[in-house]
Amino acid sequence: MRVLGVDPGLTRRGIGVVEGVAGRPLTMIGVGVVRTPADADLGHRLVAVEQGIEQWLDEHRPEFVAVERVFSQHNVRTVMGTAQASAVAILCASRRGIPVALHTPSEVKAAVTGSGRADKAQVGAMVTRLLRLAAPPKPADAADALALAICHIWRAPAQNRLQQAVALHTAQGPRRPHKLHPSKGRPA
Protein backbone atom coordinates (compact mmCIF):
# COMPACT_ATOMS: atom_id res chain seq x y z
CA MET A 1 0.00 0.00 0.00
CA ARG A 2 1.35 3.43 -0.92
CA VAL A 3 0.05 6.33 1.17
CA LEU A 4 0.59 10.07 0.78
CA GLY A 5 0.42 11.75 4.19
CA VAL A 6 -0.45 15.45 4.36
CA ASP A 7 0.13 17.57 7.46
CA PRO A 8 -1.96 20.57 6.38
CA GLY A 9 -1.09 24.19 6.84
CA LEU A 10 -1.46 27.31 4.75
CA THR A 11 2.11 28.58 5.14
CA ARG A 12 3.82 25.21 5.37
CA ARG A 13 2.47 21.70 4.86
CA GLY A 14 4.40 18.50 5.32
CA ILE A 15 4.03 15.84 2.66
CA GLY A 16 5.38 12.32 2.85
CA VAL A 17 4.92 9.06 0.99
CA VAL A 18 5.30 5.70 2.71
CA GLU A 19 4.91 2.25 1.20
CA GLY A 20 4.28 -1.03 2.97
CA VAL A 21 1.75 -3.18 4.77
CA ALA A 22 0.93 -3.64 8.43
CA GLY A 23 3.31 -6.02 10.17
CA ARG A 24 6.16 -5.56 7.67
CA PRO A 25 8.97 -3.00 7.44
CA LEU A 26 7.84 0.26 5.85
CA THR A 27 9.71 2.30 3.25
CA MET A 28 9.83 6.06 2.87
CA ILE A 29 9.36 6.93 -0.80
CA GLY A 30 9.60 10.71 -0.42
CA VAL A 31 9.23 13.54 2.06
CA GLY A 32 9.11 17.30 1.79
CA VAL A 33 7.38 20.55 2.60
CA VAL A 34 5.24 22.74 0.35
CA ARG A 35 5.45 26.39 1.35
CA THR A 36 3.47 29.50 0.47
CA PRO A 37 4.44 33.08 1.32
CA ALA A 38 2.52 34.39 4.32
CA ASP A 39 2.08 37.79 2.67
CA ALA A 40 0.52 36.43 -0.54
CA ASP A 41 -3.19 36.69 -1.36
CA LEU A 42 -5.28 33.78 0.00
CA GLY A 43 -6.41 32.69 -3.46
CA HIS A 44 -2.83 32.54 -4.74
CA ARG A 45 -1.75 30.59 -1.67
CA LEU A 46 -4.50 28.00 -2.15
CA VAL A 47 -3.55 27.60 -5.82
CA ALA A 48 0.07 27.06 -4.75
CA VAL A 49 -1.10 24.44 -2.21
CA GLU A 50 -3.07 22.69 -4.96
CA GLN A 51 -0.13 22.74 -7.38
CA GLY A 52 2.21 21.32 -4.75
CA ILE A 53 -0.14 18.48 -3.84
CA GLU A 54 -0.92 17.72 -7.49
CA GLN A 55 2.82 17.47 -8.19
CA TRP A 56 3.24 14.92 -5.37
CA LEU A 57 0.22 12.94 -6.58
CA ASP A 58 1.60 12.89 -10.14
CA GLU A 59 5.08 11.88 -9.05
CA HIS A 60 4.26 9.25 -6.42
CA ARG A 61 0.87 7.81 -7.49
CA PRO A 62 -0.43 6.93 -4.00
CA GLU A 63 -3.28 4.48 -3.46
CA PHE A 64 -4.54 6.43 -0.44
CA VAL A 65 -4.17 9.93 0.97
CA ALA A 66 -4.11 10.44 4.75
CA VAL A 67 -4.78 13.97 6.00
CA GLU A 68 -4.59 15.26 9.55
CA ARG A 69 -8.09 16.02 10.81
CA VAL A 70 -8.38 19.68 11.74
CA PHE A 71 -9.02 20.12 15.44
CA SER A 72 -10.12 23.13 17.45
CA GLN A 73 -7.36 25.52 18.38
CA HIS A 74 -7.54 28.83 20.20
CA ASN A 75 -6.23 30.74 17.19
CA VAL A 76 -9.15 30.88 14.74
CA ARG A 77 -6.92 32.23 11.96
CA THR A 78 -4.62 29.20 12.24
CA VAL A 79 -7.60 26.81 12.25
CA MET A 80 -9.06 28.45 9.14
CA GLY A 81 -5.78 28.23 7.22
CA THR A 82 -5.28 24.62 8.25
CA ALA A 83 -8.86 23.73 7.27
CA GLN A 84 -8.49 25.44 3.89
CA ALA A 85 -5.22 23.63 3.11
CA SER A 86 -6.78 20.37 4.29
CA ALA A 87 -9.77 20.87 1.98
CA VAL A 88 -7.46 21.44 -0.99
CA ALA A 89 -5.63 18.16 -0.27
CA ILE A 90 -8.94 16.28 0.03
CA LEU A 91 -10.20 17.85 -3.20
CA CYS A 92 -7.04 16.97 -5.16
CA ALA A 93 -7.21 13.33 -4.08
CA SER A 94 -10.98 13.02 -4.55
CA ARG A 95 -10.81 14.51 -8.03
CA ARG A 96 -8.54 11.58 -8.97
CA GLY A 97 -10.67 8.99 -7.22
CA ILE A 98 -8.04 8.37 -4.53
CA PRO A 99 -9.60 7.44 -1.17
CA VAL A 100 -8.94 9.94 1.62
CA ALA A 101 -8.71 9.13 5.33
CA LEU A 102 -8.70 11.71 8.11
CA HIS A 103 -6.74 10.95 11.28
CA THR A 104 -6.64 13.05 14.45
CA PRO A 105 -3.28 14.19 15.81
CA SER A 106 -3.71 12.04 18.95
CA GLU A 107 -4.63 9.00 16.82
CA VAL A 108 -1.45 9.43 14.76
CA LYS A 109 0.73 9.94 17.85
CA ALA A 110 -0.76 6.87 19.53
CA ALA A 111 -0.25 4.73 16.42
CA VAL A 112 3.37 5.77 15.94
CA THR A 113 4.63 6.25 19.51
CA GLY A 114 2.13 4.40 21.68
CA SER A 115 1.01 7.63 23.36
CA GLY A 116 -1.60 10.07 22.07
CA ARG A 117 0.17 12.81 24.03
CA ALA A 118 3.62 12.38 22.45
CA ASP A 119 5.50 15.55 21.55
CA LYS A 120 6.96 16.43 18.16
CA ALA A 121 10.42 15.14 19.12
CA GLN A 122 9.02 11.73 20.10
CA VAL A 123 7.03 11.48 16.85
CA GLY A 124 10.12 12.43 14.84
CA ALA A 125 12.26 9.87 16.69
CA MET A 126 9.77 7.04 16.08
CA VAL A 127 9.30 7.95 12.41
CA THR A 128 13.09 7.87 12.04
CA ARG A 129 13.26 4.45 13.69
CA LEU A 130 10.27 2.92 11.89
CA LEU A 131 11.46 4.04 8.45
CA ARG A 132 15.12 3.30 9.24
CA LEU A 133 16.24 6.86 8.45
CA ALA A 134 19.62 8.35 9.37
CA ALA A 135 18.02 11.44 10.96
CA PRO A 136 14.54 12.77 11.74
CA PRO A 137 12.91 14.56 8.80
CA LYS A 138 12.99 18.34 9.16
CA PRO A 139 10.93 20.38 9.75
CA ALA A 140 8.54 18.60 12.10
CA ASP A 141 5.72 19.01 9.54
CA ALA A 142 7.55 16.57 7.25
CA ALA A 143 7.88 14.00 10.05
CA ASP A 144 4.19 14.49 10.89
CA ALA A 145 3.22 13.77 7.27
CA LEU A 146 5.19 10.51 7.34
CA ALA A 147 3.57 9.63 10.69
CA LEU A 148 0.13 10.16 9.09
CA ALA A 149 1.02 7.75 6.28
CA ILE A 150 2.36 5.17 8.76
CA CYS A 151 -0.78 5.49 10.90
CA HIS A 152 -2.99 4.88 7.88
CA ILE A 153 -1.03 1.84 6.71
CA TRP A 154 -1.28 0.29 10.16
CA ARG A 155 -4.93 1.17 10.81
CA ALA A 156 -6.48 0.77 7.35
CA PRO A 157 -6.83 -3.05 7.49
CA ALA A 158 -8.83 -2.90 10.73
CA GLN A 159 -10.92 0.03 9.48
CA ASN A 160 -11.65 -1.82 6.23
CA ARG A 161 -12.77 -4.94 8.12
CA LEU A 162 -15.04 -2.82 10.30
CA GLN A 163 -16.56 -1.06 7.27
CA GLN A 164 -17.13 -4.42 5.56
CA ALA A 165 -18.85 -5.80 8.66
CA VAL A 166 -21.10 -2.74 8.91
CA ALA A 167 -21.93 -2.97 5.20
CA LEU A 168 -22.76 -6.67 5.54
CA HIS A 169 -24.93 -6.06 8.59
CA THR A 170 -26.73 -3.19 6.82
CA ALA A 171 -27.30 -5.30 3.69
CA GLN A 172 -28.80 -8.14 5.74
CA GLY A 173 -31.39 -5.82 7.24
CA PRO A 174 -32.73 -5.84 10.77
CA ARG A 175 -32.77 -9.17 12.57
CA ARG A 176 -35.76 -10.46 14.45
CA PRO A 177 -35.17 -10.91 18.18
CA HIS A 178 -35.05 -14.48 19.47
CA LYS A 179 -38.05 -15.70 21.42
CA LEU A 180 -36.93 -16.48 24.94
CA HIS A 181 -38.03 -19.55 26.85
CA PRO A 182 -40.39 -18.17 29.51
CA SER A 183 -38.80 -19.89 32.49
CA LYS A 184 -35.11 -20.00 31.57
CA GLY A 185 -34.34 -16.68 29.85
CA ARG A 186 -32.68 -18.50 26.94
CA PRO A 187 -33.71 -18.74 23.28
CA ALA A 188 -36.51 -21.29 22.87
Swiss-Prot record:
Which residues are listed for Mg(2+) 2 binding in this entry? E68
Q: Which reaction does it catalyse?
A: Endonucleolytic cleavage at a junction such as a reciprocal single-stranded crossover between two homologous DNA duplexes (Holliday junction)
Note on how the cofactor is bound? Binds 2 Mg(2+) ion per subunit.
One GO BP annotation here?
DNA repair
Q: Does the keyword DNA damage apply?
A: yes
Q: Which cofactor does it need?
A: Mg(2+)
EC primary class:
hydrolase
Q: Has the keyword Metal-binding been applied to this entry? A: yes
The record's subcellular locations are: Cytoplasm
GO MF terms listed in the record are: crossover junction DNA endonuclease activity; DNA binding; magnesium ion binding
Residues bound to Mg(2+) 1: D7, D141
Q: What is its EC number?
A: 3.1.21.10
Tell me the keywords, alphabetical order: Cytoplasm, DNA damage, DNA recombination, DNA repair, DNA-binding, Endonuclease, Hydrolase, Magnesium, Metal-binding, Nuclease
Active site, per annotation: D7, E68, D141
InterPro entries in the record, alphabetically?
Answer: RNaseH-like_sf (IPR012337), RNaseH_sf (IPR036397), X-over_junc_endoDNase_Mg_BS (IPR020563), X-over_junc_endoDNase_RuvC (IPR002176)
A Pfam family reported for this protein in Swiss-Prot or TrEMBL: RuvC
GO cellular component terms given for this protein? cytoplasm; Holliday junction resolvase complex
Stored HAMAP family: RuvC
Query: What is annotated about its quaternary structure and interactions?
Result: Homodimer which binds Holliday junction (HJ) DNA. The HJ becomes 2-fold symmetrical on binding to RuvC with unstacked arms; it has a different conformation from HJ DNA in complex with RuvA. In the full resolvosome a probable DNA-RuvA(4)-RuvB(12)-RuvC(2) complex forms which resolves the HJ.
Role this protein plays:
The RuvA-RuvB-RuvC complex processes Holliday junction (HJ) DNA during genetic recombination and DNA repair. Endonuclease that resolves HJ intermediates. Cleaves cruciform DNA by making single-stranded nicks across the HJ at symmetrical positions within the homologous arms, yielding a 5'-phosphate and a 3'-hydroxyl group; requires a central core of homology in the junction. The consensus cleavage sequence is 5'-(A/T)TT(C/G)-3'. Cleavage occurs on the 3'-side of the TT dinucleotide at the point of strand exchange.
The UniProt family comment states: Belongs to the RuvC family.
Q: What's the name of the protein?
A: Crossover junction endodeoxyribonuclease RuvC
